[in-house]
């Protein structure tokens, strides 16, 4: 931990935390360089006793310290589940107009606020957890649940919310429900933080600032949130062409058909390069009696990128043709007339398409829906 980024109370407390506790509770203290990004749209706020601020996961009070410094007359509410951090925060701001509540924010009943600011916990819900389908589909995450509750229950009309959260909010298919809500609001800022001073996390993060008023379309593209404006292209998308889109097969469904013989090729992401199929010594094959296979010609699209935080998305695709072949479920299969496949291949080869993909793909994965949304540049 860079001590210059935190108050002494936080650096001392951080030393007492185990990696297990930090991971389980999603504890990542917010460094000063990142905290400052949360206050870029607060210049018009009046520093008056009637001005109210909420920090829904206040921890040891790093973000509250910024609030106290910038708005000393405001009424500040902090909510913290962890008893130790709640106690530290209460003592730290005992002489200020700060009220710390030791509760689970997702169960907390509170009022509405002019400004909500924070860095909510990043914790994926366990398998089997029943999601609120207004927030997420598939496996939810605490950070989107915090975000939804803040917007729908605690943000005043024309109030502003500023959060540091994983960049998956921009295009993850899991979080499409809450993203549809966000897009209806005025997104003042959305910035991908490829470089940041957080400790103990390689999660790609973003800062998002939302005003509780009707949206303007800024920082949005169809059903996605992005950090650059992208022109809309009418109905001219890959998904509008006369093509069939499918995903490959999960390993569990083909495992019994694997063989050492060179029979039916089974491609994985590692085989798909830029306009090239790579067949190496570790190539997988299926027996002729497999029921899981494709036939004929197709364009194979690698959906998972090896790119890390701060790097560009590594896009891969290639045409392939054979009597029988199969792919894993990290590959999208596009089939159709040769002339139409050639159109898609030409689009994917263009630099402008690569730039487009790198704007929208901020979590290292292209979904089929996002692939279909690529314009015919």
UniProtKB/Swiss-Prot annotation:
Q: Report the domain of life of the source organism.
A: Viruses
Q: Which CDD domains does the entry link to?
A: AdoMet_MTases
By its UniProt entry, which InterPro entries does this protein fall under? DNA_methylase_N6_adenine_CS, MethylTrfase_TaqI-like_dom, N4_N6_ade-DNA_methylase, SAM-dependent_MTases_sf
In the record, biological process GO terms are: DNA modification; methylation
Q: Which GO terms describe its molecular function?
A: DNA binding; site-specific DNA-methyltransferase (adenine-specific) activity
Show the catalytic activity. a 2'-deoxyadenosine in DNA + S-adenosyl-L-methionine = an N(6)-methyl-2'-deoxyadenosine in DNA + S-adenosyl-L-homocysteine + H(+)
Q: What class of enzyme is it?
A: transferase
Knockout mutant characteristics: Not essential for viral replication it can be deleted.
Asked whether the keyword Methyltransferase is assigned, the reply is yes
Pfam families on file: Eco57I
Query: E.C. number, please?
Result: 2.1.1.72
UniProt keyword list: DNA-binding, Methyltransferase, S-adenosyl-L-methionine, Transferase
Name the family.
Belongs to the N(4)/N(6)-methyltransferase family.
Name this protein carries in UniProt: Modification methylase CviBIII
**Organism expressing this protein natively:** Paramecium bursaria Chlorella virus NC1A
């Amino acid at each position: 931990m860079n001590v210059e980024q935190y108050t002494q109370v936080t650096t001392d407390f951080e030393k007492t935390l185990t990696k297990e506790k930090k991971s389980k509770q999603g504890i990542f203290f917010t460094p000063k360089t990142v905290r400052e990004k949360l206050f870029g749209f607060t210049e018009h706020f009046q520093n008056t006793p009637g001005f109210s601020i909420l920090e829904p996961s206040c921890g040891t009070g790093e973000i509250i310290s910024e609030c106290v410094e910038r708005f000393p007359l405001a009424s500040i509410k902090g909510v913290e589940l962890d008893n130790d951090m709640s106690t530290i925060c209460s003592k730290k701001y005992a002489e200020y107009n700060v009220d710390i509540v030791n509760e689970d924010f997702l169960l907390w009943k509170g009022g509405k606020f002019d400004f909500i600011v924070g860095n909510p916990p990043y914790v994926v819900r366990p398998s089997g957890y029943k999601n609120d389908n207004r927030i997420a589909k598939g496996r939810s995450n605490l950070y989107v649940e915090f975000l939804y509750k803040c917007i729908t229950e605690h943000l005043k009309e024309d109030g502003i919310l500023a959060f540091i959260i994983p960049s998956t909010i921009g295009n993850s298919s899991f979080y499409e429900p809450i993203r549809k809500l966000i897009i209806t609001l005025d997104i003042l800022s959305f910035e991908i933080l490829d470089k940041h001073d957080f400790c103990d996390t390689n999660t790609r993060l973003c800062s998002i600032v939302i005003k509780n008023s009707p949206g303007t379309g800024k920082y949005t593209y169809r059903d996605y949130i992005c950090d650059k404006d992208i022109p809309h292209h009418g109905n001219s998308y890959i998904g509008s062409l006369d093509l069939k889109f499918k995903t490959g097969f999960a390993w569990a469904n083909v495992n019994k058909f694997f063989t050492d013989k060179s029979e039916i090729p089974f491609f994985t992401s590692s085989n798909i390069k830029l306009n090239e199929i790579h067949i190496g010594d570790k190539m997988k094959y299926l027996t002729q009696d497999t029921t899981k296979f494709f036939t004929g010609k197709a364009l194979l699209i690698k959906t998972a990128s090896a790119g890390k935080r701060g790097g560009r998305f590594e896009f891969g695709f290639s045409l392939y043709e054979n009597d029988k072949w199969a792919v894993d479920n990290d590959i999208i299969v596009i089939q159709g007339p040769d002339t139409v496949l050639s159109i898609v291949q030409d689009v994917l080869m263009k630099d402008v398409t690569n730039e487009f993909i790198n704007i929208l793909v901020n979590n290292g994965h292209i979904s089929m829906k996002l692939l279909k949304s690529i314009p015919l540049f």
